[in-house]
Amino acid sequence: MAKVINSSTDIINLGIDSSKKNLIITKDSQSAMQLMNNIQNLSNVFLLENSELLPYDFFSMAPITRAKRISSFSSFLKSNEITLVASISTLLSPCPDPSHVTPLNNLRIGENFNIQEVIDNIILSGYVREDFVSLPGQYALRGSVLDIFLTSGKSPIRIEFFDNKIETLRTFNPESQIANEKISSVNFLPSYEYPINKISIDTFKQGWRDSFDVFEEDSEIFTKTMKLRHAEGVEIYLPLFFGKRTTFLPFLRDVEKVFVQLDTETKAQEFEELIQER
């Protein structure tokens, strides 16, 4: 049963158990940010950021925002000792299917490393090759060195390999490109909230044709998607990639406590009205 909180400060007195799976729903994004500032002392707390886009906007969210969201979705899905904070509009907006935000690869020093397999996987998950890595969702390959800025990390990772084995894993500074601390393992997450592979593209194509009576070549979103490329604003068609409506409900599995800020229901109704207006 949900517990109602009056303000972002009330949560401090509720005694949240960090060893359980908790969801805190706020009335708006500003309240979510304020609440995060008030519970910084708790362990394993994540903010599911709002895309900052209006419903049906033909824009995509910023790479940093997208990376944080994917990391939060994945962490909340796989952990039973976590607290997630999100505004009601964020939870009512389209989100990825849980199957899409599970780690792609778990790499460790000394393990076998098939570079072509890894490259194929990250390309299908939306990573883009660049000469130098500076933003989440990018990778660079130079000889036996793979640089990648994962959506789940604060810093890009440098993977050095030799003879199909991982020799070193390090974070590095994207501005200076100088390696920093060593790490023992790394989990890959997708770059976008939708899959980019043959199955998902075929699903998208069929869903598009079933839903719209338009000439496909007139749509930049459709043509880019068919070429396995990211199209600005394609996220408004998120359900077409999965062949079904995607909501936050599957992520509620194993949640033990839900806290809801006062006036959240009113804000939910206002958001639904905004969707209908647009």
Predicted regions and their residues:
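ASCE RecA-like P-loop NTPase motor cores
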Residues: 1-278
